[in-house]
Amino acid sequence: GYGGKGMRIAILDTGILVTHPNFAALPDDKLDDPITRQSVDDIWYTLNAGKSTPKLNRSYYNTKLPFIFNYATADFDVSNTYAGSDHGTHVAGIAAANKIEGSKAVGVAPDAQLVVMQVFQSGGGAGWATILAAMEDCVRLEVDTVNLSLGAAAGFTDVPTMMETMNKFLESDIQIIIAAGNDTNNAYGNRWGMNMSLLPNPDTGLVGTPSTYSARSEDT
């Protein structure tokens, strides 16, 4: 099978519990062209992370987590104590949790490196300026895959800065994995003021509100 050896997976989320045993350092035989402390040092001041803080680079944690940075606070603390959620730990674990003895929990690509980019602010919510700064650094760090389980509303944009960043991704070989969207404004043909699609115009583009009944869509 495929264990993820040589892959770099960026997780833009609430940060992670870096001391979790499933994120322990990878042994040398699991590494192939890895991100190293030196490779990040070499480009540190070209990264948005490096430009946002006067502190010396402390983004390297171990061979499993070669880059950790909190883009919301411009520091190196990516613990859940700031964002108040372990969502990022969960997502990172699904993607690349190490296989450890005595545990059945293992990621899809356990031999991959994780690039941890905390973008959520205290109390929840992530600003697009913060997200875009992290995404631009993904390109410079030459990651293979970016996961964005952000829960933002679905839709389209023509904001120049956002379009520019997205175009950089299109020009690269990076695979972007984005949540389908938790909600949106279904303005076309919906019930006035209720944001619910009519039967002849069903919502098929979202996996959350309003296509699925939940606490966020009490009215069906």
Per-range role (PLM):
Residues 129-134, 213:
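Alpha-helical scaffolding within the catalytic cores
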Residues 133-142:
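Short, well-structured alpha-helical segments in soluble
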